[in-house]
Each structure stands twice: as structure tokens, then as C-alpha cells.
Amino acid sequence: METLQIAGKTFESRLFVGTGKFASSDLMEAAVLASQSRMVTVALKRVEIGRVEEDDMISRITRHPEITLLPNTSGVRSAKEAILAAELAREALQTNWLKLEVHPDPRYLLPDPIETLRATEELVRRGFIVLPYVQADPVLCKHLEEAGAATVMPLGAPIGSNRGLKTREMIRIIIEQSRVPVVIDAGIGAPSQAAEAMEMGADAVLVNTAIAVAEDPVSMATAFRLAVEAGRMAFEAKLGSVRSEAEASSPFTSFLNLK
């Protein structure tokens, strides 16, 4: 299976995971390790500047050097707030990597396309590696790519909804047109949905809620790992074409012509 490249960095896993909603830090760490993810997100709103080393959840991730910690700006409502949060994250966590989230609507948490694009342009100018969470809008994704985004991260469904790939047709267009990795972010609620995204040609998926709220998060993390691997392998193997009519896999012609 091909490795994933983002901003010149190689990732052996195409499953990214989040750290929210877990019942404990122990359970979160166990699930992350079971997932074999190499990119793990953490919300900036829970990072206390100057006391990062005392944060149990962050330390559980940073003690595994093979994992890249990806701070996210969840909770900001504008480009201005996102830029401030990004600079604080860079100071606190010593990283230029950033998952950009700008969603002013607290009910549906849908990303603001205008503020996201504005923030991306400025953050790229400041040297950040920006992975923006966006609506599944092919035109917006091209603008973000042109602005210097390292990936585009279109949603499958609203954050935490577990509703799957409700935007699949737009995602297909984004994958077809994109020259940067496409990471499906938000809404994936089952391993089968992650596999479908990978079969479509997505470069990676990000999963949090579906793992964290499962009765057995560690086993669910393993299931997502296997599903992502299977979906990617199927994509690389090239799926057969879809037909409207039946086609026998073992034609009877020779058998019927036997003398």
C-alpha cells in the first residue's frame, strides 16, 4: 500500500484520529495506539499555554515520537480568532502543523468558507502547514489549494453526527480535481463508511466520535484501521466497473457445446 505524503512528510497510516470525547486519557491512548494512526488531533481550547507538559492527554501523545500532533482551532468563529489560536499553538506545542476549523454556528458546527479561506491565506504566509476543515465544495477546495493548503478536509456529514458520507458526490469531484491530499473529516460513523471513502480515492480519513463513543473504543479503533487499509488496497487494486446488466463470471458456452 502506498504511503501518504503531506507537505513533504511521510505517513504510514491513512487513518487520522481525534482525542475528544474519550472517557479517560488511558482509554484515549490505548485507542490511538490500536488505530496505528500517525496523525492525532487535539483541540487548542484545551491547551493551557505554558503548562503543556502538565497536560495529561497531550503528554500521552507526545511520548510516542512516531505520532504527529495536529492542533486544531475548534471553537474559533473568525479568521482573526483562528490566526491568534494558531500562533498560540505554535508557541505552546512547537509545531507549524495546524488543522484549521472556523465554525461560528454552535449548533451544526459547519465551517465558514469565507473565513476559512481568509485564514488559510494568512496562515500559509506565516509559515503554517494548514489542513483546513471545509464544506464539501469543489470550488472552495480549489481556492484553498491555490492558497497553499497542504490538504483539503471536506466533511462527510456534520461533526459528531456519525451519518456517513452524505456529501459523497461532491467528494468525488473534489478527489478528481485535487492536487493535494483529500482527507475526509467529520461524519464518519462506521468502519464501512471509512472503507467507502478510501475506495472512492480519498487519501485519508479523520475519525474521532465513532471511536471515542463506542462501547469498546480500542476494538473500534482497530476496526477502523483495518477498514481504511482495506479500502485503500481496493482503490489501488482498481475496482471493477459497475454494470446495469448481469454478466456471468463463468459462461456456460463451452459446457453446453460438449459432445
From Swiss-Prot:
Record-level GO cellular component terms? cytoplasm
Gene Ontology MF annotations: thiazole synthase activity
UniProt entry tagged with the keyword Transferase? yes
Q: What family does the database annotate?
A: Belongs to the ThiG family.
User: Quaternary structure per UniProt?
Assistant: Homotetramer. Forms heterodimers with either ThiH or ThiS.
What residues does 1-deoxy-D-xylulose 5-phosphate bind to?
G160, A186, G187, N208, T209
* Originating gene: thiG
| Organism (species) | Porphyromonas gingivalis (strain ATCC BAA-308 / W83)
Q: Got any disulfides in this one, which pairs? A: none
Q: In which pathway does it act?
A: Cofactor biosynthesis; thiamine diphosphate biosynthesis
Q: What is this protein called?
A: Thiazole synthase
Concerning InterPro entries, the annotation shows: Aldolase_TIM (IPR013785), Thiazole_synthase_ThiG (IPR033983), ThiG (IPR008867)
